[in-house]
Amino acid sequence: MQSMVILGATGSIGASTLSVIASNPETYSVYALVANTNVDKMMALCEQYRPKVAHMVDEQAAKSLQERLSPSLKIEVTTGESQLESIVTSSCVDTVMAAIVGAAGLVPTLAAVKAGKRVLLANKESLVMSGRLFIEEMKKSGAQVLPVDSEHNAIFQALPEPVQQEIGFCDLDEAGISHILLTGSGGPFLTSPLSSLPQMTPAQACKHPNWSMGRKISVDSASMMNKGLEYIEARWLFNASAEQLKVVIHPQSVIHSMVQYRDGSVIAQLGNPDMRTPIAHCMSYPQRINSGVEPLDFFKVGQLSFLEPDFTRFPCLALAIDACNQGQEATTILNAANEISVAAFLDNKIKFTDIAKVNETCLSQVAKQALNSIDDILALDVQTRTYASEWVNKI
């Protein structure tokens, strides 16, 4: 029986993970559920999955949950950073699903890595913000990190087994790999007139044509910043150079990514757009379990198409690739700026096209500094958020 902690239990990845657990009750148990403020959802999850611990990041939410949970469930309710670190590093825990969205997921995810846990990485911001430090800690502790994002999971599955065992410090060239082809649907605005983009609403941006996701990642998909963050994540996970990474627009979201080999072969991973597939793969690796996802029906798929990315339409993608080439300081700044600008857009404070403007301004104006520790990273994150918030208020 594999004991799991779900970071971000009330989010979409958390829900998909718990669905896979429910389909395989003889193999997995829930040690702890972690969420931010959603007490109602956490109540329902506690009653269904009976974890040993329920942790709320928000202190008031923890108090409310404690008052509402039946004592007969015998679930310990906790809050606070030190308590969260104790949960992910507990000897009772085998696997940590790292699915807290944004920079908030960095500290607990890194704590799990340092503790040598099996970490299922859905929080791409951890690598975007702390890439080199993250990989160094992973190598030092011997933690097994498996990529949950559908694209990175697809790449992982298309790699030779020896390369899979060297995530973070593999040699793609030695393995005969010429390119990693990172696919993306292009989101809901792929064919919208460029002149209409400033008028796009949060509701329109969140209406992804293929995937069901949270609001923040949906907006990132509309701007293709999500693909940009995945580009940065792929650089660290697969130790890839800029020459080895390519982004391919694939509107149908059937091919989740590809690996191109020196001999001309291209290996792709295909499947229905359902996050339970990569989650189940990571949970059971190197075995296979039932994910609950319907098999792909090739007769219904029809045509598969591919396009080069249009950087005029998707300036956030260009910013992310450029930041990746600049280095760790730039990607940390970009991530912080993007979280502020997307939140402002979702609150109807700025236009959709202002997201890229805020991000670009922060990249050019926030002073870059050496990042030698997690404290340095968090300090730059706070500094950038302050600058981005001030800039948002000027728009």
From Swiss-Prot:
It comes from the Bacteria. The keyword Chloroplast does not apply. It catalyses: 2-C-methyl-D-erythritol 4-phosphate + NADP(+) = 1-deoxy-D-xylulose 5-phosphate + NADPH + H(+). GO terms for molecular function: 1-deoxy-D-xylulose-5-phosphate reductoisomerase activity; manganese ion binding; NADPH binding. SUPFAM superfamilies: 1-deoxy-D-xylulose-5-phosphate reductoisomerase, C-terminal domain, Glyceraldehyde-3-phosphate dehydrogenase-like, C-terminal domain, NAD(P)-binding Rossmann-fold domains. HAMAP family: DXP_reductoisom. Belongs to the DXR family. Catalyzes the NADPH-dependent rearrangement and reduction of 1-deoxy-D-xylulose-5-phosphate (DXP) to 2-C-methyl-D-erythritol 4-phosphate (MEP). This is 1-deoxy-D-xylulose 5-phosphate reductoisomerase. It comes from Shewanella woodyi (strain ATCC 51908 / MS32).
